[in-house]
Amino acid sequence: LCQFLLIEFSLSLRRKIFIWQAIVRDQSVSTKGFFCFTKLPNDLSAPCPIFTINFYMVVRIFITGGTFDKEYNEITGQLFFKDTHMHDLLEMGRSKVPVEIRTLMMIDSLEMTNEDRELIVRQCLNCEEEQIVITHGTDTMTETALLLAEKVKGKTIVLTGAMIPIKFGSSDGLFNLGSALAFAQSLPAGVYVAMNGRWFYGNNVRKNKQTGLFEEIS
């Protein structure tokens, strides 16, 4: 049986959108997200209210940099960081997934320190969302995934990135981002890497330096 507790609501011109917390009694699972009701129940304490709902999971997106967000200087030929392309990519991909975006850093993953990784861990632990996507440079993505797998439990965390900068036009970044968002909403709690259209367990994946592809360790 399910009991729905109203915790907050907002109004729009076209419909009422209610943010609810659902508690599944028989599984002792608490899930937060957006529930769009076609009909508001009269009795909120009823064990099984009868109304139609659509559930929209909120995904937290953490930006850390990497090739995914690098800019290209046409004069010098150098790559550099400016602003994240995340908002443009979500619009380009026509994504309707509710997200909360936060930039933690904009660095090459080869420059990422232990302190940077601890910051990522703390942000994942402290955020309210239980579904998280992290954009990350591919060179040390697996190191961060391994640390997250050790320290963060009870959340679905998906790391993804790109081998080619978004600004190059032929980047794999948009495809990888879409995959990561889908995996974050569908996979059980755990840490994963999403690259090349596949997902891997965060503690059992490596980047093949010869092929540029990600693969299982065993």
Where do the PLM segments sit?
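Intrinsic-disorder-associated, low-complexity terminal segments enriched in Asp/Asn/His/Tyr and depleted
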Residues: 26, 43, 54-56
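Extreme N-terminal basic, low-complexity initiation segments
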Residues: 1-12
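Active-site histidine-anchored catalytic micro-motif
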Residues: 57-218
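Compositionally biased, low-complexity segments
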Residues: 6-8, 24-26, 41
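Serine residues within intrinsically disordered or low-complexity segments
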Residues: 10-12, 28-30, 45
